[in-house]
């Protein structure tokens, strides 16, 4: 096939000339608009600005607002002095946004400055093992994330809700974190698990034995266990808890997480509640 090189070159030249004319036309139009804008009314100037720069302004405002919000939150962020999850519990006074008075009193006794630090009693986690509905599944996942991230110091809940977690090696052996004097004073309030049962549960999980059903001994009777380990402190009867929170089941117990960052504060809270109400274990 024969190509006419002369014709092809002429066509290219014509295209190039046209391309050069396009930017010139745009520039001429832009100059005309600027000239018209210079002599336009304020309303016309605003309309012109909004037409060409509206989205630039909107995006800039959003970015600035987000940056300002982040800086404000960071500057006013309080340190966590103590964080406990109240599993399957709810605040009785749902209309109040203030913490119960006993938390403020405890913080003061601990020397915790509320302007820079905070104590959190989280009642947002509800898990019903028998049904495992959507709320239970979501709460279970949330709880595991909190534990893995070292966010939690302790769990306060009823005996039934505590049982599964108490037998999963999540909580500290109280003998490892209490002084000799503290252990002697708190021993009447200990909640025990049998280490042999815990090991059997772990073995069944490793073998993926879904048919295994553990038999839990009475947590208040270590004499009936092969290897009793205190993992909880019974707070049943502490009116600061029962007057402010509703617990789904009977009894109240607190476990201190093995990876807790504020262990001493957790121990101090248990002592504060028990000493304040002179609780007799039932």
Task: Report each predicted region and the residues it spans.
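Short, Lys/Arg-enriched N-terminal segments with co-localized hydrophobic residues
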Residues: 2-23
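Short, membrane-interfacial amphipathic segments enriched in basic
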Residues: 31-44
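Hydrophobic membrane-insertion alpha-helices, especially the h-region
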Residues: 52-73
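Early extracytoplasmic/lumenal segment of secretory-pathway proteins
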Residues: 78-80, 85-159
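Extracytoplasmic "Venus flytrap"/periplasmic binding protein-like
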Residues: 132, 136-223
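Periplasmic-binding protein-like
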Residues: 226-255, 273-282
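A bilobed periplasmic-binding-protein/Venus flytrap-type ligand-binding module shared by bacterial periplasmic
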Residues: 247-264, 281
């Amino acid at each position: 096939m024969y190509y006419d090189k002369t014709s092809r070159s002429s066509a290219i030249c014509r295209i190039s000339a046209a391309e050069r004319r396009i930017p010139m036309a745009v520039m001429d139009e832009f100059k005309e608009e600027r000239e018209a804008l210079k002599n336009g009314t304020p309303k016309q100037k605003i309309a012109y600005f909004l037409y060409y720069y509206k989205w630039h302004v909107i995006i800039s405002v959003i970015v600035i607002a987000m940056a300002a919000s982040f800086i404000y939150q960071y500057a006013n962020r309080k340190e966590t002095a103590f964080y406990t999850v109240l599993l399957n519990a709810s605040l009785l006074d749902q209309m109040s946004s203030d913490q119960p008075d006993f938390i403020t009193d405890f913080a003061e006794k601990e020397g915790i400055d509320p302007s820079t630090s905070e104590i959190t009693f989280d009642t947002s986690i509800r898990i019903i093992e028998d049904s495992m509905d959507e709320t239970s599944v979501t709460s279970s996942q949330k709880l595991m994330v909190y534990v893995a991230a070292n966010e939690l110091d302790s769990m306060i809940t009823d005996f039934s809700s505590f049982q599964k977690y108490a037998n999963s090696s999540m909580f500290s052996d109280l003998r490892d974190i209490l002084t000799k004097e503290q252990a002697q004073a708190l021993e009447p309030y200990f909640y025990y698990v049998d280490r042999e049962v815990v090991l059997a549960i772990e073995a069944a999980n490793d073998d993926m034995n879904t048919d295994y059903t553990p038999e839990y001994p009475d947590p208040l009777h270590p004499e009936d266990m092969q290897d009793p380990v205190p993992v909880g402190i019974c707070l049943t009867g502490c009116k600061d808890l029962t007057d402010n929170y509703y617990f789904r089941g009977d009894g109240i117990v607190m476990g201190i997480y093995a990876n807790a960052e504020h262990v001493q504060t957790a121990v101090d809270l248990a002592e504060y509640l028990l000493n304040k109400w002179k609780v007799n274990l039932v």
